[in-house]
Amino acid sequence: MTLSAAQRISCDVVETRAEVARIFNIQRYSLNDGRGIRTVVFFKGCPHRCPWCANPESISPKIETVRRESKCLHCTPCLWDVDECPSGAFEPIGRDVTLEELVNEVMKDDVFFRYSGGGVTLSGGEVLLQAPFATQFLQRLRRFGVHTAIETAGDAPLSRLMPLARQCDEVLFDLKIMDADLAQSIVAMNLPRVLDNFRQLVADGINVIPRVPLIPGYTLNETNMARVLAFLLPSGIRQLHLLPFHQYGEPKYRLLGQEWGMRQAIPPTEDEVSAMRQLAEREGFNVTVGG
């Protein structure tokens, strides 16, 4: 999906609604977004345009309405009204929650956190668009002893990122296209700022876990991986997560009535993933596929 400059959102714009967040999903019992059993809160809105995005419903900060054809009775005339639809075919994507509501919602899973050593992960979208709320939210959870994490691309002013990161036990930090010009033109990302923010978090003693999506045609190549490793080596970090491309997001594009440019892309083979893994392991990295 291509958006005009006027339609795009930016993490440089300060979000002032620290008491309300816009989310689109709460996923329970996750094993892939940090340690233990986790509850993942997906925040709505993203400033980037990754062609491989598996959550296209996360991109717009607005609450969207979709129609599930399997439920549609094909009434005439159709009002496209969530409240009036007799079959429930229309559903909103996105809702606003207060700090208290969200704390109460995720703390229903506290027994699983304590049993497994898990906790809460904030994902998106890009959580940095709603950093003031997210920071307060994680502060509250830490008072209950909940393990906290965020998933982020790190492309925001450090003044927004650092206060949130300091409330995290883990920061799952994506490193994508490692060429500054390509990162800007393909995904609308300020790579120099991303890399500087990564260094600043590490220098502050924050537990940063770098993650690399392995995307055919974009990041699934030795050149990009070599740049990732060259960047990470001076930091002392030796943990790395590799995230192979998948097609799980394709039905979401259809639901939104959008064409997905990666629909014909083939997920990496085991040999291709293994080759990237071996590159990192030869440099002394402890590699996890998935995570």
Positions of predicted regions on the chain:
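Conserved residues at beta->alpha junctions
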Residues: K44-G45, T76, G124, T152, ...
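Pocket-edge positions in alpha/beta enzyme catalytic cores
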Residues: E64, G94, E126, I186, ...
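N-terminal [4Fe-4S]-dependent radical SAM core
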Residues: M1-H74, P86-G94, K108, F112-R114
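Active-site anion-handling motifs in enzyme catalytic cores
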Residues: V97
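Auxiliary Fe-S-binding modules of radical SAM enzymes
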Residues: M1-R35, L214-G291
